Amino acid sequence: MKRTTDPTLPAAETSAPGYPEGDRRRVPEGLTLVPTKIFFTKGVGSHRDELRSFELALKDAGIERLNLVHVSSIFPPLCKIISREEGSKLIAPGSIAFCVMARQASNEMRRLIASSIGCALPADKNTYGYLSEHHAYGQTDEVAGDFAEDMAASMLASTLGVEFDENANWDEKEQVFKISGEIVRTFNVTQSHVIANKGWTTVVAAGVFIF
């Protein structure tokens, strides 16, 4: 597909293929991997072998048939959040899928393990947001989820220049972020599990990008 040069941009900047003129998802020449959609999922798996427990956790999350590539934590501008069911229909088995993933595993009986992805979205959809990965021992869904959500929101707030107390608890910071008007939404996707059987248990939480 031919690229269209925008005269308002530096010569090295072009419209990424597939994006309409004026779209903010512009990238330097040759760098066109900007996701347009994302779906969130989570899962848990248990097996005598750690690797198999991980595979079963991916299966529970519905992403075991993908070649997953872990990336860092930026939520792209204008990226649309879709359901796990819709996302699964858009990715073919064996395809390479980029994701932000949190993973925790243990073989200790009665151990509580958790993995969580936090998300913070700016009010301006043309600005990028943040995703955070958190994995822990001894934390419930609520505790792990709040921690991940706090991290994502704090990173976004820092980028946007919103002043806040790093030592405040999540509820206090959440109010500051909402009042600022810069952060429109925060949420988390979390999987926790208490190990009840011998062998390994793995929990995963992930945000999977689609192009």
PLM features: residue spans?
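Helix-coil modules at protein/domain termini and other flexible surface or pore-lining loops
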Residues: 2-211
